[in-house]
Amino acid sequence: MNKVIDTADQAVASINDGATIMMGGFGLSGIPENLVAALHRRGTRELTIVSNNAGVDGFGIGLLLTSRQVRKMISTYVGENKEFERQFLQKEIEVELVPQGTLAERMRAGGAGIAAFYTPTGVGTLIAEGKETREFEG
């Protein structure tokens, strides 16, 4: 099976509405511009985007936010995108804020086939509200 794909449009052809996509980038560096542009052209909607940030207005993930293609954002920082802020305040987008280290560990664990892990990060904060807590050896 040939795993080489010639274009970004071909690469996203099988990404359907409602998909969860993890995107790289840190601030404005490392943004997967070709992936974002191809998803934008395809018009894939109801996406859950996992990234450490929500991009900026009209660029990167911000392009998908402006075209209302993102249903949920799982991120560690979302502070520079006015369209994200507007959608969040109007309750038009679901948001899961996660500490940076916890998000990285979730990615690592998922890639390794580990279904769950425990971390003390966030215990006793707003992030922990509504989530299971356990005490070990304590």
Regions found by a protein language model. Give the residues of each.
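Conserved alpha/beta enzyme-core scaffold
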Residues: M1-G138
